[in-house]
UniProtKB/Swiss-Prot annotation:
InterPro entries: DUF167, YggU-like_sf
GO cellular component terms, A-Z: cytoplasm
HAMAP family, A to Z: UPF0235
Organism (species): Nitrosomonas europaea (strain ATCC 19718 / CIP 103999 / KCTC 2705 / NBRC 14298)
Domain of life: Bacteria
Protein's name in the database: UPF0235 protein NE0395
Any Pfam family hit: DUF167
PANTHER family in the record: UPF0235 PROTEIN C15ORF40
Similarity comment: family membership: Belongs to the UPF0235 family.
Length: 100
């Protein structure tokens, strides 16, 4: 199993994420088991961490935030997220990691 998969027509990207809220900055940090670990600067209060996650993913995948759907894990660190209509693949989440 992988931390990502594609829907039938490849216009849907499904991500399995492990999210760590309350970090110094928002960034993808690497693979943790079968999930991609993402650190979020936002705290898990009043949905702020989920909003920060969807904003981060929308920016990385160059899609509107409405194209990012949290399918599972609204109140968990383990999340399943769908990205619709992105021309970018999952490798865009690692762009900052390679630059360092």
């Amino acid at each position: 199993m992988s931390w990502y998969s594609f829907g039938n027509d490849r216009s849907l990207l499904i991500l399995k994420l492990y999210v760590q809220p309350g970090a110094r900055q928002t960034e993808a940090v690497g693979i943790c088991g079968e999930e991609l670990k993402i650190k979020l600067a936002a705290l898990p209060v009043d949905g702020k961490a989920n909003r920060a996650l969807t904003e981060f993913l929308a920016k990385r995948f160059n899609v509107p935030r409405k194209n990012i759907t949290l399918k599972r894990g609204e109140q968990s660190r383990h999340k399943v997220v769908e990205v619709c209509q992105s021309s970018n693949g999952p490798e865009v989440l690692f762009s900052e990691m390679r630059a360092e």
